[in-house]
Amino acid sequence: DRFMAGSVLGTAVLARVREVLASSHPDVTERTTVSQVALRRRRGFAILWRPRQYLGDAASELVLSLALPHRLESPRFKEVVHPARTTWMHHLEVASVDDLDAEVVGWLREAADAAG
């Protein structure tokens, strides 16, 4: 988990995401780059990334981005963008493992389902 090295929060959140998906989507794979950890099935559906790596003064240490075929309406999202006709990206700032509550776990599983 070299990408999350040095981030206690990042390591804990990645472990929680793995735990959540292990039971419902055991076929999930990970691709780690210098900038992110991407979770995939047939397609990518979630990305954990550290904004401070690029925006030194960023307020959030960690962001979970979820790809869905539709827009979710929630004030919890920092930003929602529509980069492609069939994809909505939902950016959630994560300040604690507790932020991955039942609502977020539901969104994560929905994104994994949609990625096929």
PLM feature spans:
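Charge-rich, low-complexity N-terminal segments
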Residues: 1-19
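Structured alpha/beta reader/binder surfaces that contact nucleic acids or chromatin modification marks
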Residues: 15-31, 47
